[in-house]
Amino acid sequence: MNWLRWFKIKNIYVINGPNLNFLGIREITQYGSTSFDELINLVNSEAKKLKIKIDFFQSNVEGEIVNYIQNLVNNENTWIVINPGAYTHTSIAIRDALQTYSQNNEIVEVHISDINQREQFRKINLISDICNKSIIGRGVQGYIEALEYINEQ
């Protein structure tokens, strides 16, 4: 057992892209009835149990997400948990920012719905190959699985 990891608090930045602030309102059959605020509470509760420090960021604006990631590039031993939403399929800018971040840090991609079982255009994923792990189609539980994965590293 690695005793050192029990004393080290990990810093995780949870980034959510467009329309995720509408969880519990939009497309409940795809995304479930959990609201965005409930998701934040759920993740914070699990993080507290695991002694993980969490910072949340959500934006519907691509450039704001890029700026947020760029501001994290020089932070060492941090993780990003990202659900880029629709930007998964379209944003080279977010991919480039994540790729720079990944040179010194780790990334877990989360998608609430199974993007591989949806419309053809959603099967394009511009970020999965630069992420350490992808958790897809597990509902909001995917965020908890991301924390558990990070905690095991």
Regions found by a protein language model. Give the residues of each.
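Short Gly/Thr/Asp-enriched flexible loops that form oxyanion-binding sites at enzyme active sites
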Residues: 90-102
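Glycine- and acidic-residue-enriched helix-capping/strand-helix junction motifs
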Residues: 23-38
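Short beta->alpha junction loops
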Residues: 55-63
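Extreme N-terminal starter segment of soluble prokaryotic enzymes
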Residues: 8-13
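Short, glycine-/small-residue-rich phosphate/pyrophosphate-handling segment
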Residues: 103, 116-153
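Short glycine-rich anion-binding loops that position phosphate/pyrophosphate groups of nucleotides
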Residues: 18-20, 85-88, 113-115
